[in-house]
A protein has these predicted regions:
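A short acidic/basic microdomain associated with nuclease active sites
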Residues: 42-59
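Solvent-exposed, charged helical/coil patches
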Residues: 1-47, 123-125
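Nucleic-acid nuclease catalytic cores
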Residues: 82-125
């Protein structure tokens, strides 16, 4: 059996996500969940960067375009949040691109508009 990377940190991040879902439920805009998570992360002392640009390169040349994941927590976990009916392959691909363009190995994809419970996936490179 393979080791689960960043087990404790991802557990703490997901705890904050579950709390936001419990308080708000589904149906809000993604930006609302984003703001609520920033508050919840501060309350739980979870270190995070919000919308921090990830630089992109092509053949050693830095691109003007960059990726901006919703959160980078603990300097090692990408958290991408959604407020959609269901998570699609394009959402998973987006998280994988974030990981490929950085040194990070773990991404969490969380959908707050799924009912009756929070939808979430771990994506590991």
């Amino acid at each position: 059996m393979s080791e689960i990377i960043h087990r404790q940190e991802s557990f703490e991040i997901m705890g904050a996500c579950f709390e936001v879902y419990k308080e708000n439920g589904p149906g809000f805009l993604e930006e609302v969940y984003h703001e609520c998570l920033k508050i919840e992360f501060r309350l739980r002392n979870i270190p995070f960067l919000s919308k921090e640009p990830l630089p992109l390169t092509y053949k050693g040349h830095r691109l003007v375009t960059s990726y901006e994941p919703d959160f980078i927590c603990y300097d090692r976990i990408v958290l991408e949040i959604k407020a959609v009916t269901s998570v699609a392959d394009i959402h998973r691909a987006k998280v994988k691109h974030y990981l490929k363009s950085s040194v990070l190995r773990l991404g969490l994809l969380v959908n707050f508009c799924h009912y009756p419970k929070l939808e979430h996936e771990r994506i590991v490179l």
